[in-house]
C-alpha cells in the first residue's frame, strides 16, 4: 500500500511538474512580445487562410499585431536574400515549402528555434537541427470543372493529360518545380523526361499561383488544372462545379514549414506566432479552411484529404540542392513562347 501511495505521489508530482513547465514556457513566450507589439510574417499561405490564422492569434494575444506579406515561395526567398544582402531585416517568421526553406537554411537565413508545441509532432515533421517545423501538407492533384468535362472524360492519372483532346486546355503553375522534380525522383530521368516533353507539347496554359488556378478552373477559363485539393474543397462548399482526382499515382505532396528568420527584429513575437500555429488551436484553424494539418491529434476536415488513403510521394528533403537545375529545365520546357 505504501509503495502504491509513493507511486501515486511520484506520478502526480511529475504531472504537476510537466504542467508547471509548460505554463512557464508559455509565460516566457508571452513576456517578450508584449514589448515588441508586432510580428512580420512572410508566407505563401493564401490571403483568406493566413487571415484566419492571424484572427485567431490576435484574439488570443490582443497586444500583438501581425503584418503579413504573401507571395510565391521563390519570390519570398529572393526577397529575403535581397534584404539580407542589403543589411535590412524586416521578416520575423517565414512559412514556405520545405524545399524553399531548405534553400534559405543553407544560405544562413534562419535561426534555430524549437517551439514547445513542436513536441507534439512526429520526427519527420521537424527539422533535425530544429530550424523549422511542418504546419500542413499540400497535395498536387488534377482538378477539373465538372460542368465542362463529362464524367467519362475526367482525367485520373498524370498520363491522361497527354490525350490530344487536352491540348491547350489544361493549366499549371508557372513555378511547378516541386511537382516536376519529385516526378523525376520517383519515375527516374528516362520516364519522366519522356512524359514532360510530351506534356510540354500539349501546350499547357501557365498561371501564377495555385489559388488563382483553382479560381479560374471554377470560372471555366479551362477545364483541367493542376491544383491543391483543399482549395477545390473550399470552392465546392461555395457551390463551384469543381472536383479532383484521388487516384493519381503518385500524388506529389509538399510540406509547408514555419521558421524564425535569422535576424528577426521581433523574435519573441515571431516565436509566439510559430508556437500558436503549431498548437492544437492553430492547427484546428488550418483544418477548418480545408487544409491538411500535420499535428497528429487534428484530422482533416474533409475525409478525402486523409493522407493515408492517397498514393503520397513526398517532395524529397534534399530537393533544394537540385532546385536551380529543375527550375531551368522546367522553364526551358514550358516557358517557350
Which positions does each model-derived feature cover?
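Extracellular/periplasmic bilobal clamshell ligand-binding domains
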Residues: 302-337
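Periplasmic-binding protein-like
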Residues: 123, 137-140, 166-175, 196-200, 205-207, 277-300, ...
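Short amphipathic alpha-helical coupling segments at ligand-binding clamshell hinges
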Residues: 53, 191, 195-198, 256, ...
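A bilobed periplasmic-binding-protein/Venus flytrap-type ligand-binding module shared by bacterial periplasmic
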Residues: 141-148, 184-186, 254-266, 285-286
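A ligand-binding cleft/hinge motif common to bilobed small-molecule-binding domains
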Residues: 99-103, 223-241
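Extracytoplasmic ligand-binding site segments that recognize negatively charged/polar headgroups
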Residues: 27, 42-55, 66-84, 88-221
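Bacterial N-terminal signal peptides
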Residues: 6-17
Amino acid at each position: 500500500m505504501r509503495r502504491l501511495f509513493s507511486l501515486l505521489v511520484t506520478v502526480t508530482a511529475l504531472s504537476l511538474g510537466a504542467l508547471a513547465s509548460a505554463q512557464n514556457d508559455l509565460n516566457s513566450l508571452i513576456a517578450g512580445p508584449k514589448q515588441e507589439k508586432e510580428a512580420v510574417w512572410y508566407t505563401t499561405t493564401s490571403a483568406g487562410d493566413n487571415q484566419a490564422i492571424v484572427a485567431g492569434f490576435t484574439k488570443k494575444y490582443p497586444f500583438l499585431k501581425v503584418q503579413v506579406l504573401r507571395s510565391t515561395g521563390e519570390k519570398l526567398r529572393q526577397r529575403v536574400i535581397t534584404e539580407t544582402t542589403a543589411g535590412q531585416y524586416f521578416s520575423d517568421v517565414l512559412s514556405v515549402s520545405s524545399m524553399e526553406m531548405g534553400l534559405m537554411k543553407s544560405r544562413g537565413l534562419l535561426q534555430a528555434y524549437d517551439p514547445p508545441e513542436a513536441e507534439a509532432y512526429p520526427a519527420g515533421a521537424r527539422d533535425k537541427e530544429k530550424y523549422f517545423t511542418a504546419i500542413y501538407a499540400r497535395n498536387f492533384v488534377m482538378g477539373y470543372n465538372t460542368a465542362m468535362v463529362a464524367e467519362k472524360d475526367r482525367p485520373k492519372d498524370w498520363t491522361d493529360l497527354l490525350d490530344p483532346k487536352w491540348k491547350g486546355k489544361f493549366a499549371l503553375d508557372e513555378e511547378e518545380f516541386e511537382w516536376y522534380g519529385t516526378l523525376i525522383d520517383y519515375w527516374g530521368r528516362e520516364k519522366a523526361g519522356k512524359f514532360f516533353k510530351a506534356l510540354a507539347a500539349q501546350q499547357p496554359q501557365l498561371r501564377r499561383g495555385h489559388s488563382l488556378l483553382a479560381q479560374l478552373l471554377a470560372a471555366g477559363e479551362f477545364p483541367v488544372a493542376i491544383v491543391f485539393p483543399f482549395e477545390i474543397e473550399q470552392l465546392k462548399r461555395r457551390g463551384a462545379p469543381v472536383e479532383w482526382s484521388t487516384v493519381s499515382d503518385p500524388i506529389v505532396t509538399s510540406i509547408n514549414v514555419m521558421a524564425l528568420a535569422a535576424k528577426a527584429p521581433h523574435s519573441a513575437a515571431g516565436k509566439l506566432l510559430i508556437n500558436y500555429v503549431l498548437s492544437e488551436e492553430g492547427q484546428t484553424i488550418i483544418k477548418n479552411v480545408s487544409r491538411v494539418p500535420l499535428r497528429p491529434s487534428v484530422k482533416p476536415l474533409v475525409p478525402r484529404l486523409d493522407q493515408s488513403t492517397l498514393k503520397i510521394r513526398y517532395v524529397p528533403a534534399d530537393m533544394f540542392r537540385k532546385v536551380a537545375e529543375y527550375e531551368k529545365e522546367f522553364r526551358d520546357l514550358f516557358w517557350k513562347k
